């Protein structure tokens, strides 16, 4: 998405919306995480609950602040993209024609170089940040009361929803901002299956985490700072919670 923005295909607002709302975990990744969390028997219910939450998020969040106020402007250095459809061609025909012309410009050399650049970016940019943020997050969660203090308002909400171990589960709703895997790994400490299922599904539905997506957004020059990223993360969490709670009651009990 960042490359598409730089190439002039998306405006800043479109790029931010796609990065924060139009991404979700693949089935295979969800299955691996269910095994990590001891929920492999609930793989299909988890998929239903997660997708039931992320679709409303994708519909509603682009219409509220801060995504709604992002500027609809293209990158300064990007070439002008012609989007007008010529007369006599349908959208499908014009799209196919553009796709063929674009494919003709790609050579094996360009393809290999682009692949090498992508994997190098993952190895040297993303992985070090993932390890740093995840390790720091685990240390802060295990040895300080920071997350317990910040997530104190969630405890009565989880109690009202009928989840056991609310005080233990509440910090897991916020650690997902650092890395998506943190709440999944921490959920193993929960003995109540419904609470573990709820935390697991919310963690996957949150999508936005600083160890990867957050860092990429900040580096992509779409004018979306860490404060705005955190607000969208909270919005996704708050919107996802009642939906996943309903599915938990329906599918687990």
Short names for language-model regions:
Residues 2-40, 44-59, 180-253:
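C-terminal transmembrane helix pair
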Residues 51-56, 93-98, 127-135:
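Hydrophobic mid-bilayer segments of alpha-helices in multi-pass membrane transport proteins
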Residues 59, 63, 147-148:
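Flexible hinge motifs at transmembrane-helix junctions and intramembrane kinks/re-entrant loops
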Residues 63-72, 169, 222, 248-253:
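A cytosolic-side transmembrane-helix exit/cap motif
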Residues 67-120:
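Intrinsically disordered, low-complexity non-transmembrane regions of multi-pass membrane transporters
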Residues 100-191:
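Transmembrane helical segments that form the transport core of multi-pass membrane transport proteins
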